[in-house]
Amino acid sequence: LCALAEQNAVRNGFGDRVKVVNTDITAPPSLLRAAGLTREGYDQVIANPPFNAEGTVRAAADRARAAAHVIGAEGLSGWVRFLATFAAPKGRLTLIHRAECLAELLSLLDRRFGAISVFPLFPKRDEPATRIIVQGRKGSRAGLRLLPGLVLHEGDGSYTAEAEAVLRGGEALDLGG
């Protein structure tokens, strides 16, 4: 996935401005530095933490795949702590997670990040959001904004025109930032 992210950055003209790092968020600081990470060195930190708690899903046989799907003992707090460590002052954090984890995420971001925007992703019209994209600015005291979000699928399962525009047409999501 890291190679794909790097290829996408190059393809979209950001190859010289994007750094993709494949590391373990629980690694000791010396290993993180060796991987090229700089404390408070990034204007934007982005994460897609695993959504599933250990024991709630059948673990994949492949260790790397299992790690990508099951959050470790560090939980969401470890992910937020990691991202906060590497976000520059006034830098942005962006992550996607389950909608049911919103309260926990807001609590973890409190006093570290402000100007929080919550962008819900709805599987279909008239269904509750199942995923959220949360974005905040490190050190900001600005308040929370709940954005309109995006409906992903029509009743027949096909993508909505808005989702197609993002997924296939390169349209940006308006995260209000």
What does each model-found stretch correspond to?
Residues 72-129, 133-134:
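Conserved Class I SAM-dependent methyltransferase catalytic core
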